[in-house]
C-alpha cells in the first residue's frame, strides 16, 4: 500500500543511527506515523522540522504498519521563525497539542486546514504573533476541542439563555455565563476573552493568558486527560512566555 499527500510535520524522533519516527497530519488520513530513513542526517534534518508543510510519500505492506516515509518540502515554516521566539513557541505548542490529542488515522480536515493556514501566516510575517497570532492559536485550540468532542458552548448564557455580555465559562460544563449571571460563582469560573466571540479581535496580553487558561483546562482534563497524559512541555513553555510578557509589549491597545 502507498499514498502521497500534502502533510504537516508534527514531530520527528530519532530512531537508530540516522532514521527518524515522524508524525504527520494529513487532510484525508489524519494523524499518521512513518519511518524516515536518514531523517536525522544533516542533509535531511531540515525537511522533518515540526511545522513544515511537505509532499509526503508513504509506503507499507498494511495501512496500520509503520511504513517508510519520504517527502519534498513545500513550505518551511520552522526555519522562518528562528528569529521570532514567540511565533516559534506558538508553532511548537500547536504541533505538540495536535500530535498528542488527535487519534491516529482519523480524518480531521478542518483542523488540518486551519493549522496549515496558521503556520503559513506565522512564517510569512513572524511579527504577527503579537497582532492576532495568539488569538488565532487559541481559536484553533477551541476548534480542536470541538472536533474531538470536548467543545465549549459559547452561544448563550447557561443561566439566562441570553447571548449578551458573555464573560465566563463553567469549568465543569464548558458553557458560557454572562457577567451579570455569574454572581457568587464568579471566582470558580474561567474568564472568556472576547477574542473567542469575535474573530477580528486580536486580544490583549491578559486575554491571551486567560485564553490559554481556558482552553488549557479542557485540553488537560479532556483531550489529554482521557489519554492519561499531561499537557505537552511546548504548551507549558508558551504559557510561561505569555505570562512573562509586559502589557503593551506587543500590541498597542494592551
Curated annotation (Swiss-Prot):
- One matching Pfam family is RecO_C
Where does the source fall among the domains of life?
Bacteria
Keyword check for Ubl conjugation: no
GO BP field: DNA recombination; double-strand break repair
Say if the entry is tagged with keyword DNA damage: yes
Alphabetized, the UniProt keywords read: DNA damage, DNA recombination, DNA repair
A cellular component term from Gene Ontology for this protein is: bacterial nucleoid
Protein family (similarity comment): Belongs to the RecO family.
Record function comment: Involved in DNA repair and RecF pathway recombination.
The name of this protein is: DNA repair protein RecO
- Source organism per entry reads Gluconacetobacter diazotrophicus (strain ATCC 49037 / DSM 5601 / CCUG 37298 / CIP 103539 / LMG 7603 / PAl5)
Lineage of the species this protein comes from: Bacteria, Pseudomonadati, Pseudomonadota, Alphaproteobacteria, Acetobacterales
The primary gene name is: recO
